[in-house]
Amino acid sequence: IPIKMNKDFERALSTIDAKYGEDFEILNGFNESQLNFSDFIDGFVDKNVADVTIDGNANAHHKDICSMLGEKGKSEDKLFAFNKIFYELKKKYGLRTAKEWLETEYNGGFYLHDAPSATYKPYCYAYDLTRLAKEGLFFLEDYNNKAPGHLTTFLDDVIEFVSFMSNRSSGACGLPNVLLWTFYFWKKDCDEGYFLRDKDYYIRQSFQKFIYRLNQPFLRVDQSAFVNVSIFDRYYLEALFGGVEFPDGSFAIDYIDELIKHQKIFMEVVSDIR
């Protein structure tokens, strides 16, 4: 099966392969046993997923047909990604620079996150959840979405949002103000009598379910989503979110102490689970 790549890239990669040997070739995912689908499938059946995948940060652990199909093409995708980056560097900065980059990437001097998809999809984004909190699942077409009214529905919407956005990027999904909005909906539920029993129990249970659901392998065949939740000290909370107005007309600046405690509860729940 012919695979067409830049000739200078092919020559440079061949020279590097000869210089560093088979061990480096395997580490990079460019060994014939990894590029050949038949050999890969045979190896996948006989080994652990972590020993077969070329992406050690893939967050995939289970051996099944879905994970096999997800991992099978990564060597080819990485090869084409390197070819594309090499071509663009050569075009902009010359062949010598492109060769230097390729060798430094190959020998571990550089590390390209999620290399198999590096030239196809963006890596990480941080998302402001204000619109999600006020409008609901606005990003889904042909969907009669409504703004979340309670903490449970807001967290459900966040899960859907993370799934949607994570499948359109290769890295982490940052949620810098998710705890700001969980605080608002938790306080709203408690003030309006939606939850009348132990308020501390309510938020801890909600956080626990949220964390467990985010860690389910619902992303890209057999991965859990990479999610970053930000924790801020008093000065950052005041500077970044103090002026945020909640839908009820109150401002985040009025609840800084409560927000600090809210963040602490979240971290306690994470610690208990981990």
Language model regions located:
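Catalytic alpha/beta active-site cores
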Residues: 1-274
